[in-house]
Amino acid sequence: MSGWMTRRHGLQALAGATLAAWSTPWSAWAQGAAAERRTSPTPRLVSVHSSLTETIYRLGAQDTLVGTDTTSTFPEAAQRTRKVGYMRTLSAEGLLALQPTAVLATDEAGPPVVLAQLRQAGVPVHLVPSTLRFDDVLAKVRLVAQLTGREAQGRALVAQLQAEWHAVQAQATSPATPSRAGAPRVMFVMAHGGGAMTAGRDTSAHAMLQLAGARNALEQVQGFRALNAESVVLAQPDVVLTTTESLAFLGGAERLWQQAGLSQTPAARHQRLLAFDGMALLGFGPRMPSVLTQLQRQLA
C-alpha cells in the first residue's frame, strides 16, 4: 500500500509540475474552449467506460454524448461515437477538442496528469469508484441521471436493477443451490489481443463468480496471470468461463481447449465452456444482474 501511495503522490506531483509548465497559448486555448462550453444549451458528455456509456443509453440520454472511450462498444450505436482512446491512456487535447461540459469515468481512468489538465481547463471530471460491488452499478445510474437531467428515468432503472439483484441473491441462497463447498470450480480465461490470461482474486471476474455462487478455481492467485499448464492442471476447473471476444480472437472453442493445460481438465472432458460479452460480464454496468442470472442458470 505504501508503494502505491508513493506512486500516487509522485503522479500528483508530476501533474502539478505539468500544469505549472503550460504555455500561454495552451491556457488561452483551454479558456476559449471553456467559454464555448458554457454557452452549450445541453450537456456535452464524454463517457470513459463501457458501463457508463451503456447507462447513458439505458436512460435515453445518448443525445448528450459527444465522445466515448474504446471500451464503449455496446449498444452498437456507441461504436459510431467519436472515440477518445483507451480509458487508461487518455489525451487532454483529444478530450478538450470535443468541448465537453463534463467527463464521466471510473477511477481506473487516466493518466492522472490528463485528468488534472481537464479540471484545470474547467471541465468537471466525475469518477465513480470501482469496488466490484453491485453498488457500483447504482452509483453509475445515479450519476448519469443527475448529469443528464433524467432523474425520473434513473429512479426507475435503479428500482428495476434492484429487483433483478434481489432475484440473483435469492437464487444464490436457495436451498436448491449447492453450498460453496459443492459449487462448481470455474476458471476464467481471457485473450483479447495477447497471450491468454487467467483471473485470481481482486478481479472483476472473481467478483462475478462469487456473486453467482461459484468458486474461482484460481482463488489462491492474486490478480491476472498468464495461462500456464501447471496451474491449470492443478486447478482442475469444472467449467471454463470466457468472453465472446476471447473466443473470436483465439479462433473458436476448439482452439481455446488447445491452450496450455486446458485439455487435461474436467471442463474439457465434459465440454463445459461458457462465454459472455466481455463488458457485460466484467464491466459492472446495467447488464450485470441479468448476466449473473444467466451465469447462475448455466452453472446449475
Label each PLM-derived region with a short phrase.
Residues R38-R44, V113-M197, A214-Q220, V239, ...:
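Extracytoplasmic substrate-binding proteins
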Residues S2-W4, H9-A30:
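N-terminal export signals
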Residues P25-L45:
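C-terminal segment of N-terminal export signals and the immediately downstream linker at the start
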Residues R44-L98, A102-V114, A253, L262:
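A short, structured surface patch at a secondary-structure boundary
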Residues H49, D107-E108, S130, V221, ...:
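Short secondary-structure boundary segments
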